[in-house]
C-alpha cells in the first residue's frame, strides 16, 4: 500500500470530518434566527435568502436551507423542487416535507416526518419569477428547459461557494409535478458540469411526457371506477382524445401545434365526468375529493390561503431575508412564469431520463389518487422507455412495500402496518405507488414518503419490503401504573417458576428410586 494512497484516504477523511463539523456553522448573511409563530423550543438550523446572482441572471433565485437533524446524514443534501411551471417550493417546505408545517388555522408545528431526518434539505424557488424569486427583465422570465437548467446550474455553483461545507456532500434532487421536466434537465447539467456529487433523482407524480398522460387519462378513470368503458361518454371523450393525440404526433419539433385540442380534452373530462356536470367536478389532484367547477382542485390544498397570508407577512418576509423591494408578497404559482415557459424540449425528457439511468438511480413515485399525472401514465412511460439496452421492466411482478417510519399508522392498522403501495426496481429505475395519496404525496402521507425516500437514498429497499414486526399496543396508563403492572407480572412469573421447580424436584425424587422394567426378549 503506497504512501500516496494513505495520504489521499487521510485527506478525504479529514475533508469529510471538517465538512460535518462545519455544518453547524452560521452564515450571518442568510441565517434565520427566528420566525413568527414557530413552536417554542425549535432549534433547527435555517438559512434563507438570495446569492446575489443579478449580474449574471438578471434576477435572483430564493432558497431555504434546513440543516440535517440526524448526525448520520449531515453529509447528504437533498434539493426539493415544486412544479408549475412557476410554483414555489415553499409549498414543499411548509406543507409537505420541511420541519415546520402550517395548518389551515395558520398554526406552525414541528413535522416529525420531515426529510431533515435524512439530510440537509434545500428548497429553491425557480425558475426566476417564482415564489420569492424575482426577475429584473422580461427576458429573464422567458424560459424553457435549457435556460432553466443553465440558470439553476449557475445557482448551484454559487451556492457551494457560499456554503463550501456542502460542496463534498452526496446530493439528491427530488420534486413533483412539472418538476418532472425540471429535475432531469438539471440533473443532466449538474452531472455534465460536475458541480456536485449527484447520486440520484426522485420524481413524484411527474409531468414527464405529455403523450403518456393524455393517452392514459381515460384508462385511469375506468380503473378508478369514475368512467365506464364503452359508454356513450367514454366514446365521446375518446373522439376528443384522438384529436389531442394527433396534434402531439404532428409535433415533430417538440412543440404543440394545436395545444387547444389537448386543453379541450382535459376540460371536457373535468366537465362531464361528474354526477353534476358543470356544477361540481372531481379534484384533479385527488379524485376522492370533489370541487366546484371549473376549479376542479385549483383551490387545493386547503392550507393555501393560510400559507399565502403567513409567507406574505412583513415580519416573516423580513425574517427570511426576502427582497421586499422586488417581491411585495408571496404567490404560490405565477401565471406569468407559466405562460412564458416554452414547451421546447419537453418531448425529450424521457430520453434524458434514459441517459441518466446509465449514471444514477432514478425513482418515479405516484400518489394513486392523482388524475393529472397518474400512475397509469407512469406505467405506460416505463413500458416504452429504453435504457441499458432493453425496453421497460423485464420482470412484470410488483411487490408490496411497508412504511417503516409510520408509528401512528402501525397502531391504526392493528398489529401490522398495511402495505403502503407497490414497488418495482430494475436497472437503476424504481417505480412505486402510494395508496390513498394525492398529487402531493408528502402532504397526505409524510411518514410513508419518508420511509420510501429513505430506502431510495440508502439504495436498500429491503428495509421496506419486509412486513414490520408485530406491535404491542400499551394502554395509556401513568408510569406508576405501568411500573406496578410490570412488577406484579415479574412476581407472578417468579412464583409460578418456583412452584414448577419444586414440583419438578419432588417428582424427580419420587422416581429416582425406581428401576426401569427391562423388555422381555422375543
From Swiss-Prot:
Highest taxon listed in the record's lineage: Eukaryota
Broad class of the protein's primary localization: Golgi
Record-level GO BP terms: apoptotic process; proteolysis
Residue spans, topological domain Cytoplasmic: 500-522
Lumenal side: 23-478
Enzyme Commission numbers on file: 3.4.16.6
Catalysis performed (reactions): Preferential release of a C-terminal arginine or lysine residue
Signal sequence residues: 1-22
Localization per record: Golgi apparatus, trans-Golgi network membrane
GO cellular component, one term: trans-Golgi network
Glycosylation sites: 52, 75, 104, 197, 395, 428, 436
PROSITE patterns, per database record: CARBOXYPEPT_SER_HIS (PS00560)
Keywords: Apoptosis, Carboxypeptidase, Glycoprotein, Golgi apparatus, Hydrolase, Membrane, Protease, Signal, Transmembrane, Transmembrane helix
Pfam families: Peptidase_S10
GO molecular function: serine-type carboxypeptidase activity
Active-site residues, Swiss-Prot/TrEMBL: 177, 370, 439
InterPro entries: AB_hydrolase_fold, Peptidase_S10, Ser_caboxypep_his_AS
Functional description taken from the UniProt entry: Protease with a carboxypeptidase B-like function involved in the C-terminal processing of the lysine and arginine residues from protein precursors. Promotes cell fusion and is involved in the programmed cell death.
Similarity annotation: Belongs to the peptidase S10 family.
Designated name of the protein: Pheromone-processing carboxypeptidase kex1
Amino acid at each position: 500500500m503506497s504512501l500516496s494512497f494513505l495520504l489521499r484516504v487521510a485527506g478525504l477523511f479529514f475533508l469529510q470530518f471538517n465538512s460535518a463539523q462545519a455544518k453547524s456553522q452560521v452564515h450571518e448573511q442568510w441565517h434565520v434566527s427566528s420566525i413568527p409563530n414557530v413552536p417554542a423550543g425549535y432549534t433547527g438550523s435555517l438559512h434563507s435568502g438570495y446569492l446575489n446572482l443579478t449580474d449574471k441572471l438578471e434576477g435572483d433565485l430564493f432558497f431555504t436551507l434546513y440543516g440535517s437533524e440526524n448526525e448520520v446524514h449531515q453529509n447528504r443534501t437533498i434539493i426539493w423542487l415544486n412544479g408549475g411551471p412557476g410554483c414555489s417550493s415553499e409549498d414543499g417546505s411548509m406543507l409537505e416535507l420541511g420541519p415546520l408545517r402550517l395548518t389551515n388555522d395558520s398554526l406552525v408545528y414541528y413535522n416529525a416526518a420531515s426529510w431533515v431526518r435524512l439530510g440537509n434539505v434545500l428548497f429553491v424557488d425557480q425558475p426566476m419569477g417564482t415564489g420569492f424569486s424575482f426577475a429584473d427583465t422580461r427576458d429573464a422570465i422567458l424560459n424553457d428547459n435549457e435556460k432553466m437548467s443553465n440558470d439553476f446550474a449557475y445557482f448551484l455553483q454559487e451556492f457551494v461557494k457560499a456554503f463550501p461545507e456542502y460542496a463534498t456532500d452526496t446530493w439528491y434532487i427530488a420534486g413533483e409535478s412539472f418538476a418532472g421536466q425540471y429535475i432531469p434537465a438539471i440533473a443532466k447539467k449538474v452531472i455534465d458540469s460536475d458541480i456536485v456529487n449527484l447520486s440520484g433523482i426522485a420524481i413524484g407524480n411527474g409531468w414527464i411526457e405529455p403523450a403518456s398522460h393524455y393517452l392514459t387519462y381515460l384508462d385511469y378513470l375506468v380503473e378508478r371506477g369514475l368512467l365506464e368503458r364503452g359508454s356513450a361518454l367514454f366514446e365521446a371523450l375518446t373522439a376528443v382524445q384522438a384529436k389531442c393525440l394527433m396534434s402531439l404526433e404532428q409535433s415533430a419539433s417538440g412543440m404543440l401545434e394545436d395545444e387547444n385540442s389537448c386543453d379541450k380534452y382535459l376540460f371536457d373530462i373535468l366537465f362531464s365526468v361528474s354526477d353534476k356536470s358543470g356544477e361540481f367536478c372531481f379534484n384533479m389532484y385527488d379524485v376522492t375529493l370533489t370541487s366546484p367547477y371549473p376549479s376542479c382542485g385549483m383551490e387545493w390544498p386547503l392550507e393555501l390561503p393560510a400559507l399565502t397570508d403567513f409567507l406574505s407577512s412583513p415580519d416573516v418576509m423580513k425574517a427570511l431575508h426576502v427582497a421586499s423591494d422586488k417581491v411585495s408578497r408571496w404567490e404560490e404559482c405565477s401565471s406569468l412564469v407559466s405562460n412564458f415557459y416554452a414547451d421546447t424540449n419537453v418531448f425529450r425528457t424521457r430520453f434524458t431520463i434514459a441517459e441518466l439511468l446509465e449514471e444514477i438511480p432514478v425513482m418515479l413515485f405516484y400518489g394513486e389518487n392523482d388524475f393529472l399525472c397518474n400512475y397509469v401514465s407512469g406505467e405506460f412511460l416505463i413500458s416504452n422507455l429504453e435504457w441499458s439496452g432493453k425496453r421497460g421492466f423485464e420482470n412484470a411482478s410488483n411487490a408490496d412495500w411497508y412504511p417503516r417510519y409510520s408509528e401512528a399508522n402501525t397502531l391504526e392498522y392493528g398489529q401490522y402496518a398495511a402495505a403502503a403501495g407497490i414497488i418495482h426496481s430494475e436497472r437503476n429505475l424504481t417505480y412505486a405507488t402510494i395508496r390513498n395519496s394525492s398529487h402531493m404525496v408528502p402532504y397526505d402521507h409524510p411518514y410513508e414518503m419518508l420511509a420510501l425516500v429513505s430506502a431510495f437514498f440508502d439504495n436498500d429497499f429491503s428495509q421496506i419490503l419486509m412486513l414490520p414486526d408485530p406491535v404491542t399496543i400499551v394502554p395509556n396508563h401513568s408510569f406508576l401504573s405501568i411500573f406496578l403492572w410490570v412488577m406484579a407480572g415479574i412476581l407472578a412469573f417468579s412464583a409460578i417458576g418456583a412452584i414448577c421447580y419444586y414440583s419438578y424436584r419432588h417428582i424427580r425424587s419420587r422416581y429416582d428410586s425406581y428401576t426401569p422394567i427391562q423388555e422381555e426378549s422375543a
